């Protein structure tokens, strides 16, 4: 098949080479951005008298027709074309004849594809950001519901100190809020227009790059034409942000998986977000959370694939850069899918308050508060720490808990103990004493909820 770029060569390539070289099976998803960019480009060419207004009007009308026909299904994208840019230009030329051949004036596919992918990823970034905000809202609403629900807090997966389930959930809300901030920051660098950089050196035509940038929603220009066509930092940065976001979702998923197990029984997932077993009728498997955890590695792989592709490329454009899209598109699709399932999974998740509280009553998670009680009586912390540890060891040896020890036993370890110690080591008291900013007290959790909602 002869190509629109035939000139130096006859354009007659082997079928296997055509298939190997083609990107339309994956870059066709950018047809809307490609056509929108071309309409603005045609208008700019007319505004600078590079083509006539009549030709520009015909080009824009023809492009609108192609867009409408693709949207309606009347025009299937020809997968035999090399890429989406060539498909659109070929279809336009078929409809308009020689006028269609004027569209590519003062433009290269190098800056055209750089434009398309920035516009496409800008939209996808905004979609992901909104999905993350929906998840933050779901997590925050759940945190408010359970702001007084006592559970063990863990370090090393060992029971450590009493917290509330609301406090634990708000930790994820804060992580996700940082993800939103990172995406917004990435968008600033992404939203620079490369159109007008042409192949690599700019153009001899008196174009108006600012006109195109403004009308395509960009905040400014790529100010070096070599950089404009070869830059894929915004892809790598977006995928880095996605990798961190997926890491947060994976950590949350891991805890949901643990919490929903019989060993914990802290939460119950809706049947709508679990599956059964083909052989074990009693099973209720947290497959959605497990898949999110598994797909995290996939997004990491997409990022590493892109970075590896880019690491040795000389300036400016190289065909290797065609390989950026499949990695980026896969990461976009995966992240969106994970968020779309995560939001309702959290919204429908129920906490088992009795099991959480029962778990908090074991493991001596109020031992720190016992030490703090002695510190407030005037004992140095390290001395108080030692006494508290000795009392825990005594309880373990005698199969009891701190709350059940008589005062006489406490007095054998320190004469600073009195009846008030039982209030000090009460679990709800332990929680409510954590009044520092960011702490687990109900008031502190309420302040965190208020902050996050204001930030959204």
Mark where each language-model region is.
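Short runs of predominantly hydrophobic/aromatic residues within well-ordered alpha helices
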Residues: 38, 85, 89, 235-238, ...
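Conserved hydrophobic residue
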Residues: 50-51, 75, 265, 380, ...
